[in-house]
C-alpha cells in the first residue's frame, strides 16, 4: 500500500511538472500558442477523468470548462482557477529555468507553482481521488472554470459568464487561487481584497479668494 501511495504521489508531481512547463504568459502575444496549449492539456486531463471538457475560444485566451457527469438531486460545486502566469523578467535573477521545475530544499521552483497551477491541479487531483475512492462517482456535481487571463485582468471572463450563465449555475463557488497560512496548516480563505476605483470631480473659483471673506 505504501508503494502504491508513493507511485501515486510521484505521478501527481509529474503531472504538476508537465503543467508548469507550459510558458502560459497571458500578457505576451508571443506566448498565445503556449497559453492555448496549456488549456488543451487541461481539457485532456479533465476528459480523462470522465468530465465533459471544452476550451472555449474568446477574443483573447481560452476559458476551460469541465463538467462531471451530472447526478440529479446533488448540489453543484464550481471550482474557479486560472492557468495563465506572470512574465518572468528579469529572467537573469532566476536561479533556474522558470519553466523547468526544480526542487530545492523540498520546494518546487517554477513560474506558476503557487499562482495558480499548483492550487488548480491540487483541486483537480483531489476530485480525481474522490472519484477513485467512490467507484468513479462524486458526492456533488463539479464544474471546473479555468481561465487564461487572470494575470491581465480577466478581460474575457465577464462576457463569458453572461453568455454561459445557465451552464455554470451552481450552489457553491470555490476559488482555487489562494495560499495557506503555513505549509502544515490547511487553510480556507473566505475573503480577499478586491479592486475599487473612483473619479473625483472638484469645482471651484477661477481666481484666488480670501479665506477670511469667502472661507
Identify what each model region corresponds to:
Residues 181, 190, 197, 211-215:
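Acidic-enriched catalytic cores of C-N bond-cleaving enzymes acting on peptides and small amides
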Residues 2-91:
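N-terminal helical capping/dimerization or prosegment-like subdomains
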Residues 116-191:
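Acidic/histidine-rich catalytic neighborhood of metal-dependent amide-processing enzymes
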Residues 187-203:
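Flexible glycine/proline-rich, aromatic-decorated loop/lid segments
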Residues 74-146:
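Active-site metal-coordination/substrate-binding segment of hydrolases
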Residues 108-110, 206-212:
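Short small-residue beta-strand/loop micro-motif enriched in glycine and branched aliphatics
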Amino acid at each position: 500500500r505504501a508503494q502504491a501511495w508513493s507511485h501515486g504521489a510521484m505521478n501527481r508531481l509529474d503531472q504538476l511538472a508537465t503543467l508548469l512547463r507550459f510558458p502560459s504568459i497571458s500578457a505576451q502575444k508571443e506566448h498565445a500558442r503556449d497559453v492555448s496549449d496549456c488549456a488543451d492539456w487541461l481539457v485532456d486531463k479533465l476528459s480523462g477523468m470522465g468530465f465533459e471538457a471544452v476550451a472555449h475560444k474568446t477574443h483573447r485566451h481560452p476559458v476551460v470548462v469541465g463538467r462531471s457527469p451530472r447526478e440529479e438531486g446533488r448540489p453543484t460545486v464550481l471550482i474557479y482557477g486560472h492557468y495563465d502566469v506572470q512574465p518572468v523578467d528579469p529572467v537573469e535573477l532566476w536561479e533556474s529555468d522558470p519553466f523547468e521545475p526544480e526542487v530545492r530544499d523540498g520546494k518546487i521552483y517554477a513560474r506558476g507553482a503557487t499562482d495558480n497551477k499548483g492550487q488548480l491541479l491540487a483541486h483537480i487531483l483531489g476530485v480525481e481521488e474522490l472519484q477513485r475512492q467512490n467507484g468513479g462517482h462524486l458526492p456533488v456535481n463539479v464544474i471546473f472554470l479555468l481561465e487564461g487571463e487572470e494575470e491581465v485582468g480577466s478581460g474575457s471572463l465577464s462576457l463569458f459568464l453572461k453568455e454561459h450563465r445557465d451552464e455554470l449555475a451552481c450552489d457553491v463557488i470555490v476559488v482555487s487561487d489562494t495560499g495557506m497560512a503555513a505549509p502544515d496548516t490547511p487553510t480556507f480563505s473566505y475573503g480577499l481584497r478586491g479592486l475599487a476605483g473612483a473619479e473625483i470631480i472638484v469645482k471651484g473659483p477661477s481666481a484666488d479668494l480670501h479665506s477670511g471673506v469667502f472661507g
